[in-house]
Amino acid sequence: MNRKILRAGAVALAFAAMPLLSIANETSAKDVGKKFDEAGTAIKDYSVEQRDEAVKSAKAALDDLDAKINRLAADIDAQWDKLDASARKKAYESMDRLRRERNDAAEWLGALKHSSKEAWGDVKNGFSKSYDTLASSFAKAKEEF
């Protein structure tokens, strides 16, 4: 049952991650964290006049993270039969948290596209915080699995 739920989550993430970007096979959790910290911080530097660039940058960062999450889900799925009950539960919980946090970041991305000038600063900060949370959770999950 848990395997079916994990696969369903992986499929949902795959659909959310179109188009997927290529993934480096050997990336440490620290490298991942640093790269994603830079992406989240970069969004904060855009002015409302640079909205299109900010959205493009945010989408690319989110797409890249989606691809890495999908790869992690595939790796977990490939090892599922070798995991004990505790590790399976942890994997399921990690993927569920990533899915929820990814959805939150996607909502902020939508807000970036449509925010008013007055709300721009709050929306940028909201996306950055949401993205940073997601990236941190991914780095932690990658390190655990």
Task: Identify what each model region corresponds to.
Residues 1-11:
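Bacterial N-terminal signal peptides that target proteins for export
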Residues 10-20:
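Bacterial N-terminal signal peptides
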Residues 22-145:
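Polar-face residues of amphipathic alpha-helices and helix-prone low-complexity segments
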